[in-house]
Amino acid sequence: MKMLKEVCPSPSVIFDLGVRNPFSEIMKQNNYKVYNTGGEDLDDNHEMEIPDDVDLVTGFEILEHLVSPYPLLKNIKANRILLTVPIKLWFAKAYKSETDPLDRHYHEFEPWQFDWLLEKSGWKIIKKEYWKNPSKKFGIRPLLRKFTNRYYAVYAERTKESYTNCYKGELNL
């Protein structure tokens, strides 16, 4: 919430990639108006309609679930984004649910990889933050998590050239 408040103070209008979730409610409680996607597959539907009053598009732990996040990032009609992704850890395998095919990580990025993806899709990174996810469990991996960044947040703005092409409809892939 801290980074969101820094890059887009309330009251503001947020378009959050992903279905309504507990964080959507927290944003509302902090005086943000929040729109969410409706649960559609964002790999297939990367040309979504974003309301004109939106100040910022957010995606919290969403892009790792896409086979290819590039078309979504390239085509999204927004000027500003705030995204978070899990960082690939050398001591843990990527997450996959055995029961829910939508709850699987196709990607866990190293920060430089995510930066390159954003830059290639027409975004200029303005601010970055990292944080840890310590566990109260006992063991080697929980101990390593106390000292290892697990999540990466990026605030970016669309580059001028990319903005012009996106709003002319020239980016569809």
Annotate each language-model stretch with its function:
Residues 2-3, 7, 21-25, 67-173:
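S-adenosyl-L-methionine-dependent methyltransferase catalytic module, highlighting the catalytic core
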Residues 10, 52-54:
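Alpha-helix C-terminal capping/helix-to-coil transition sites in glycosyltransferase folds
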Residues 11-20:
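Conserved class I S-adenosyl-L-methionine
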Residues 18, 35-41, 129-132:
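A short beta-strand-loop structural module common to alpha/beta enzyme folds
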Residues 26-52:
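Adenosine-cofactor binding site in Rossmann-like domains, unifying the SAM/SAH pocket
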Residues 58:
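A conserved beta-strand element that flanks and buttresses the S-adenosyl-L-methionine
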Residues 61-65:
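A short His-aromatic
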